[in-house]
Amino acid sequence: MAESNPRFPRSIESLQAKLTDQSGSNRALLLMAPLLAFELLVFVVPFFILLRISLAEESSDLVYAEGTWTLEAYSSVLTSDLIWSIVGYSFLLGIVVTVLSVLLGLFYAYAIWRSTGLLKSLLLFSVVLPLLTTLVIRTYAFNPLLAPSGTLNELLLSLGLISSPIQFVPGTIGVVIGQLYIVLPYAVLAIYSVLATMDWHVVEAARDLGASRPRSVLEVVVPQAMPGVIVAAVISFAWSVGAYAAPDLLSGNITFAMQVEGLMLSDMRYPLAAAFSVLMLLLMLVSIAIMFTVLNRIGGEFELA
């Protein structure tokens, strides 16, 4: 009588497990196919078109001189003092708005997380409400509010807090306020979505062990909320560096997006505009990578403190 092979059932089980894993991978890839196709058509293909234009010679009749290859546009961008001053202003605006949006977003998200009932609904509604209006309308509304004879200056003068009107707009202060108003709701929602998954009893346990309120927030809440903080920082920074509406409506200073518009629509220098865009994209990716690393280290230091 033939002896049964004890390895045979195990081989069957192993094969079934492999087939199940492969089926799950294929299903996941199939579900991701529409998103991958969207990313390919909307981001990857346009980027390579942009890169091709940046490597071509300029043409007075066409977008670029077809069949030409040159690094002249990149040379012009890298040696232009005007371009680098615009880069510096755009990144400075992005850094200031990002710091303010993360700090204010963290406080506001924490307030929503700890509130209950009607107050919580009102706080959430006040975050979502600005998103129900168009970007241009809610940005342009800051002109009568922040003008030298606007509502804010009149209020400060009537309270005796200032002796003469403050020049908010046109100016960088007005741009920071307007851009902060644009990105703050997204920062709040990103941070709150993480805080909403936290267990408040962990914070209470830290306080029972002797941690003060500020220390329990810094060492328990902030490290746990760091994924939301990173998302808020990336959104705020990328949007603010490439901002167009707020700088255009509230300031006379030229930003990256405004300069690209001028090069394309007014000067018809598409290769130069494309090279400037590629350079800014690379600088933003490097900056976001540095910011991601720094925020992760800060979160780790708070957690280990």
Where are these regions (language model features)?
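Coil-to-alpha-helix initiation sites in intrinsically disordered, low-complexity, charged segments
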Residues: 3-14, 68-72, 150, 212, ...
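Hydrophobic positions on the alpha-helical face of helix-turn-helix-like DNA-binding modules
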Residues: 205-206, 216, 260
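Glycine/proline-centered hinge or cleavage motifs at structural transition points of membrane proteins
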Residues: 209-211, 223
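C-terminal transmembrane helix and the adjacent membrane-cytosol boundary/short C-terminal tail
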Residues: 2-14, 192-207, 274-305
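Glycine-rich helix-loop "coupling/hinge" segments at transmembrane-helix boundaries
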Residues: 61-67, 243-268, 303-305
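A short amphipathic helical element positioned immediately N-terminal to and/or at the very start
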Residues: 18, 69-78
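Cytosolic juxtamembrane amphipathic/interface segments immediately preceding
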Residues: 15-29, 33
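Membrane-water interface segments at the C-terminal ends of transmembrane alpha-helices
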Residues: 27-60, 75-77, 81-165, 169-196, ...
